[in-house]
């Protein structure tokens, strides 16, 4: 039997709104997926197609999240680590080894390594990067459907000029990260 290696990555540390989303993926070495790379290097159409293929072909995968409230309470780094723990612990099997994109590891009891630029180096991290990105983008599309005036489908919650203009006109929703400086500053003005 081969070792079960999980790849983990996060999406959404920089946006002003929504969850930070992480994914853990254990790929099937007998069922390879072509075209895996860092999700940021792929078109949206290709990401969505690959995310579907990953969900179908991976041995196991799971999403972990931390809410805006948790981000505000813990800070973005600790909330991201919490979301990663949730992603891995939510897998139906315990991985033998975990590779995490970046330079930090969560405080957990898994044999693991942090890999800088891991989403370009290891297929399992690339797969995690892709399904986390598609999951978070879908969150923003749903939010856009509820609040089209903010154009969440366009800026995905990131601090763009158009996003700040929408906040100035329509206000700050509950899904905003109130500890993030631009949001905090706007709340203090009120």
Swiss-Prot record:
Keyword vocabulary terms for this entry: Cytoplasm, Endonuclease, Hydrolase, Manganese, Metal-binding, Nuclease
Reactions performed catalytically: Endonucleolytic cleavage to 5'-phosphomonoester
Record flagged with keyword Nuclease: yes
Cofactor: Mn(2+); Mg(2+)
Enzyme class: hydrolase
Binding note for cofactor: Manganese or magnesium. Binds 1 divalent metal ion per monomer in the absence of substrate. May bind a second metal ion after substrate binding.
GO biological process, one term: DNA replication, removal of RNA primer
Annotated family: Belongs to the RNase HII family.
Protein name as annotated: Ribonuclease HII
């Amino acid at each position: 039997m081969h070792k079960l290696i999980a790849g983990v990555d996060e999406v959404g540390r920089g946006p002003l709104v929504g969850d930070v989303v992480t994914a853990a993926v254990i790929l099937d070495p007998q069922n390879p997926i072509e075209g895996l790379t860092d999700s940021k290097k792929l078109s949206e159409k290709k990401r969505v197609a690959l995310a579907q293929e990953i969900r179908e072909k991976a041995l196991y995968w799971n999403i972990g999240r931390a809410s805006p409230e948790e981000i505000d309470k813990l800070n973005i780094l600790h909330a991201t680590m919490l979301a990663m723990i949730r992603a891995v612990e939510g897998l139906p099997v315990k991985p033998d080894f975990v590779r995490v994109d970046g330079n930090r590891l969560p405080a957990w009891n898994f044999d693991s390594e942090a890999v800088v630029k891991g989403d370009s180096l290891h297929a399992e991290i690339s797969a995690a990067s892709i399904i986390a990105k598609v999951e978070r983008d879908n969150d923003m599309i749903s939010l856009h459907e509820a609040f089209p005036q903010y154009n969440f489908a366009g800026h995905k919650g990131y601090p763009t000029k158009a996003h700040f203009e929408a906040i100035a006109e329509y206000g700050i929703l509950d899904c905003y990260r109130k500890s993030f400086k631009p949001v905090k500053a706007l709340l203090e003005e009120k």
